[in-house]
Structure formats: structure tokens, C-alpha cells
Regions:
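General structural signal for secondary-structure boundaries
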Residues: 7, 33-34, 83-84
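Short, catalytically relevant binding-site loops at active-site mouths
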Residues: 3-4, 22-23, 79
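C-terminal catalytic subdomain
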Residues: 48-74, 78-135
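Short acidic-glycine loop/turn motifs at beta-strand connectors
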Residues: 1, 7-12, 131-135
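PP2C/PPM family metal-dependent serine/threonine protein phosphatase catalytic domain
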Residues: 10-60, 104-116
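ATP/adenylate-binding site constellation spanning eukaryotic-like Ser/Thr protein kinases
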Residues: 1, 10, 19, 75, ...
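Short hydrophobic-aromatic micro-motifs
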Residues: 5, 14-16, 71-74
Length: 135
């Protein structure tokens, strides 16, 4: 599964997609919290896979980006290793090259050496950061 997240410079979460999975739907509906979702034994079960016959493509809300918004697109390894509020805090400010290096470092560290009280799941790690150029 993947993460799409949009945050403003001040840290306001403007958009987050719902994971196409039973755990993602349970999280979205409030049946479980983020902590329970990250550690759920079925967190890797997905209900929508690219290239399958039953694949569906959902178009989310149309949103206008502000000059200092940051868009994050990532594989599931980012939300499997950082809480959403941590991701927002890391990406909301700073040069994207530094933000990317910082994200990579903390995710790789948590994959190698999971710490109590923090998520940590070894997996492939892919992400894209985008921020509109100031007008």
C-alpha cells in the first residue's frame, strides 16, 4: 500500500489518503488507532493492487497547493516506520534535499534497530517529496 500526504508549512495535515486495506479502513473509521494499525498483524493485506483484474483507481479531492505545502508520496515503509505526526514534522519545512536525507536516515535506522515505543518494520523504501516553487 502507499501513502499520500499533504501538509502545510505550519504542520497542518491537509490531506491523507486511506490505505486500501482492512487495517486502513479500520483506522479511517476509528475502530483502531494509528498505534494499533502500525503493529497490526494484518497491516500488509491490501485490497487493491496495480495490475490485477479487480484494480480500481480512485481520484481524491482536487486541492490547490499553497506555495509552502509539501506533498509526500511513499511506499508503505514510510508510515510503517514513522507516525503521521512525525512525517509531518520532518517534511513541513527545510530544503527538500535535506528533508529527504533526514527521512531516509530515520527510516533506515528504525528498520535496522527498532526502538521500543516506535514503529519499525524492514521493507523496501521509496518516496517522492514535492513542494511548489514560491510564486
Amino acid at each position: 500500500d502507499s501513502l499520500i500526504l499533504l501538509t502545510g508549512q505550519r504542520g497542518r495535515l491537509k490531506f491523507q489518503n486511506t490505505s486500501h486495506s482492512p487495517v486502513g479502513y479500520a483506522l479511517e473509521s476509528g475502530f483502531i488507532n494509528e498505534e494499533e494499525a502500525i503493529h497490526h498483524e494484518e497491516r500488509n493485506l491490501v485490497s487493491n493492487v496495480i495490475g490485477t483484474v479487480g484494480m480500481s483507481i480512485e481520484i481524491g479531492p482536487e486541492m490547490e497547493l499553497s506555495p509552502r505545502d509539501t506533498l509526500v508520496l511513499s511506499s508503505d515503509s514510510l508510515p510503517d516506520n514513522l507516525y503521521v505526526d512525525e512525517i509531518v514534522e520532518y517534511v513541513r519545512t527545510g530544503r527538500l534535499e535535506r528533508v529527504a536525507a533526514r527521512l531516509t536516515g530515520i527510516v533506515e535506522q528504525r528498520m535496522r534497530n527498532p526502538e521500543p515505543g516506535h514503529p519499525g518494520h524492514s521493507d523496501d523504501f521509496t518516496f517522492i517529496l514535492y513542494r511548489p516553487a514560491p510564486g
